[in-house]
Structures are given as structure tokens and as C-alpha cells.
Amino acid sequence: MSQVSISKFGNPIERVDRAIDALVSGRGVLLVDDEDRENEGDLIFPAGNITAEQVALLIRECSGIICLCLPPERIEQLGLPQMVTCNTSAYQTAFTISIEAAEGVTTGVSAADRATTIRCAAALDARPEDIHSPGHVFPLRAVEQGVLGRRGHTEGTVDLMRLAGLAPAGVLCELTNVDGTMARLPQIITFADEHGFPVLSIEDIAAYRSQPIKKSA
């Protein structure tokens, strides 16, 4: 069990409040899950106004598998089928088929192109004809109950956007070390300190949603 803690970023309610403030201002946050689950930290940004610079940061510092987290109704609005009919992944991560914006991109792989695709698919009035498949952005379908139904980064991302009063669409990518290994909590905290990102956990979001009376004013 790691002795490193995110308590330096406040108590659970304070950590969520600080993450909300960052997201409302268009900045990113780092979301960690349980050490006994994936034991990873995802860098998250609001999807609706994501910039090429933010996508470039995800490509440079993270795994490169940039995912767009959406609730079920938005996935259905876009007409996106699941990547597989029988999901046998360890944590039931609900990938749909990958996507590309139908217009405004070239090869689709650059940071600018991926930002265009994300903004296109995240638009409240987005339609199936606005996107093509396959592509270089990977949508994820959150469960309807959010983190109260599944303790995943996908659900945490969508819940955070809703708590922030934003459209329920967020981008995530797993933070990695320079050597390509997955960043664990000590490296995640160091990265957060260096770049000024708030850190919170999926359990923080569950506590925030379950005990709204304890939200700070």
C-alpha cells in the first residue's frame, strides 16, 4: 500500500470544488482511481472548448489514447455502436467505434485535428453525419448512474462536467512516465505540482454526490 496521499490537495469536498473551479475556467484536472483498481491518473479537460494545445499536452505527457467520455444519451444521439458486442475487458471499459470529424480535419491525427473532432462530437446538436469512423478519437460510454454505478474514470469525467455545470462531455488520457510506464500516485502528484493541476479521486466524486449537504458554500 502506497503511503503517498492526495490529502495535500484538501479534503474530498474541497478537492472536488477545486476541480470544478478549474474545469469551469477551461483548465484540466487529474483524476485518480483506487490503488487496487487501475491505479492510474487521468488528465481530464472539458470537451466542448478543448484546444489544440491541450490535446498536444495529452499526446506528449499521456498514453496518446485520447478518449471522449459521454453519457448514454449522447452516444445514442451520435449513433455510435460499441466497439465489441461482448465486452471481456477487465473493467468493462465501454469503448465505441473510433471517430473523426466529417469536416475541418486532414489526416485526423494532429492535435488540432483531434481537438476539432472532439469539439464536433461534443456539440449539443451533433448528429451522426457530423462524424466519420474509424478515426483517432475514442469515445467511451459512461453508465447512467455515473460513479455511483461504476467507479471508473469515464463516469468520473462525465460526473465532473455535470457538477461543473458544463455539457456532459469530457476528454481523458492516462498520464504516463517518460519511459512509457504508467504514472502512479507519486508521479501524478509531482506532475500536478509542476503544472498546477488539481488532483482528486473517483471516491471524492462519489462522496460529493452522496453528501451534497457537505458541499462548501
Swiss-Prot record:
Taxonomic superkingdom: Bacteria
Membrane-spanning residues: none
Binding sites annotated in the UniProt record for D-ribulose 5-phosphate: 37-38, 42, 150-154, 174
GO MF annotations, alphabetized: 3,4-dihydroxy-2-butanone-4-phosphate synthase activity; magnesium ion binding; manganese ion binding
Keywords assigned by UniProt, alphabetized: Lyase, Magnesium, Manganese, Metal-binding, Riboflavin biosynthesis
SUPFAM superfamilies reported for this sequence: YrdC/RibB
Site (Essential for catalytic activity): 136, 174
Keyword Transmembrane recorded: no
Cofactor binding remark: Binds 2 divalent metal cations per subunit. Magnesium or manganese.
UniProt pathway: Cofactor biosynthesis; riboflavin biosynthesis; 2-hydroxy-3-oxobutyl phosphate from D-ribulose 5-phosphate: step 1/1
Keyword hit for Ribonucleoprotein: no
Gene Ontology terms: biological process: riboflavin biosynthetic process
E.C. code: 4.1.99.12
Stored InterPro entries: DHBP_synth_RibB-like_a/b_dom, DHBP_synthase_RibB
Oligomeric and partner information: Homodimer.
Function, in words: Catalyzes the conversion of D-ribulose 5-phosphate to formate and 3,4-dihydroxy-2-butanone 4-phosphate.
Family from the record: Belongs to the DHBP synthase family.
Entries under NCBIfam families matching the protein: ribB
Name of the protein: 3,4-dihydroxy-2-butanone 4-phosphate synthase
